[in-house]
Amino acid sequence: MDMRVPAQLLGLLLLWLRGARCDIQMTQSPSSLSASVGDRVTITCRASQSISSYLNWYQQKPGKAPKLLIYAASSLQSGVPSRFSGSGSGTDFTLTISSLQPEDFATYYCQQSYSTP
């Protein structure tokens, strides 16, 4: 039995498989918040479809490149203080800062790495 697949069909199949994972929308909340040193801060991120644990959190300060804090939803990047933690899987994720420090005042972003454009 000939099991060869025409190249065109294989190409279409690969496009379909890739397309099934694209166009994932990420919604972060709150969009802004007021907090004081010592506060416990929680930021949430929701994906429009399941992304398993393919979720990263970044911190960015003005004029600086984003800094990776958390990868794979809950793994702390080397050198990042333990007051930062991440949790969640599927569609709902949380970044928590257990006790806000002066150097933590920044912008925080979530990023899914389940699919790429």
Swiss-Prot record:
<keyword id="KW-0393">Immunoglobulin domain</keyword>
<feature type="region of interest" description="Framework-1">
    <location>
        <begin position="23"/>
        <end position="45"/>
    </location>
</feature>
<dbReference type="InterPro" id="IPR003599">
    <property type="entry name" value="Ig_sub"/>
</dbReference>
<keyword id="KW-1280">Immunoglobulin</keyword>
<dbReference type="GO" id="GO:0002250">
    <property type="term" value="P:adaptive immune response"/>
</dbReference>
<keyword id="KW-1015">Disulfide bond</keyword>
<keyword id="KW-1064">Adaptive immunity</keyword>
<feature type="disulfide bond">
    <location>
        <begin position="45"/>
        <end position="110"/>
    </location>
</feature>
<dbReference type="GO" id="GO:0006955">
    <property type="term" value="P:immune response"/>
</dbReference>
<dbReference type="InterPro" id="IPR013783">
    <property type="entry name" value="Ig-like_fold"/>
</dbReference>
<protein>
    <recommendedName>
        <fullName>Immunoglobulin kappa variable 1-39</fullName>
    </recommendedName>
</protein>
<comment type="subunit">
    <text>Immunoglobulins are composed of two identical heavy chains and two identical light chains; disulfide-linked.</text>
</comment>
<feature type="region of interest" description="Complementarity-determining-3">
    <location>
        <begin position="111"/>
        <end position="117"/>
    </location>
</feature>
<keyword id="KW-0472">Membrane</keyword>
<feature type="region of interest" description="Complementarity-determining-2">
    <location>
        <begin position="72"/>
        <end position="78"/>
    </location>
</feature>
<feature type="signal peptide">
    <location>
        <begin position="1"/>
        <end position="22"/>
    </location>
</feature>
<dbReference type="GO" id="GO:0072562">
    <property type="term" value="C:blood microparticle"/>
</dbReference>
<dbReference type="Pfam" id="PF07686">
    <property type="entry name" value="V-set"/>
</dbReference>
<feature type="region of interest" description="Framework-3">
    <location>
        <begin position="79"/>
        <end position="110"/>
    </location>
</feature>
<feature type="region of interest" description="Complementarity-determining-1">
    <location>
        <begin position="46"/>
        <end position="56"/>
    </location>
</feature>
<feature type="region of interest" description="Framework-2">
    <location>
        <begin position="57"/>
        <end position="71"/>
    </location>
</feature>
<dbReference type="GO" id="GO:0005886">
    <property type="term" value="C:plasma membrane"/>
</dbReference>
<keyword id="KW-0732">Signal</keyword>
<dbReference type="InterPro" id="IPR050150">
    <property type="entry name" value="IgV_Light_Chain"/>
</dbReference>
<dbReference type="InterPro" id="IPR036179">
    <property type="entry name" value="Ig-like_dom_sf"/>
</dbReference>
<dbReference type="GO" id="GO:0019814">
    <property type="term" value="C:immunoglobulin complex"/>
</dbReference>
<keyword id="KW-1003">Cell membrane</keyword>
<keyword id="KW-0964">Secreted</keyword>
<comment type="function">
    <text>V region of the variable domain of immunoglobulin light chains that participates in the antigen recognition. Immunoglobulins, also known as antibodies, are membrane-bound or secreted glycoproteins produced by B lymphocytes. In the recognition phase of humoral immunity, the membrane-bound immunoglobulins serve as receptors which, upon binding of a specific antigen, trigger the clonal expansion and differentiation of B lymphocytes into immunoglobulins-secreting plasma cells.</text>
</comment>
<feature type="domain" description="Ig-like">
    <location>
        <begin position="24"/>
        <end position="117"/>
    </location>
</feature>
<dbReference type="GO" id="GO:0003823">
    <property type="term" value="F:antigen binding"/>
</dbReference>
<dbReference type="GO" id="GO:0005576">
    <property type="term" value="C:extracellular region"/>
</dbReference>
<dbReference type="InterPro" id="IPR007110">
    <property type="entry name" value="Ig-like_dom"/>
</dbReference>
<dbReference type="InterPro" id="IPR013106">
    <property type="entry name" value="Ig_V-set"/>
</dbReference>
<dbReference type="GO" id="GO:0070062">
    <property type="term" value="C:extracellular exosome"/>
</dbReference>
<keyword id="KW-0391">Immunity</keyword>
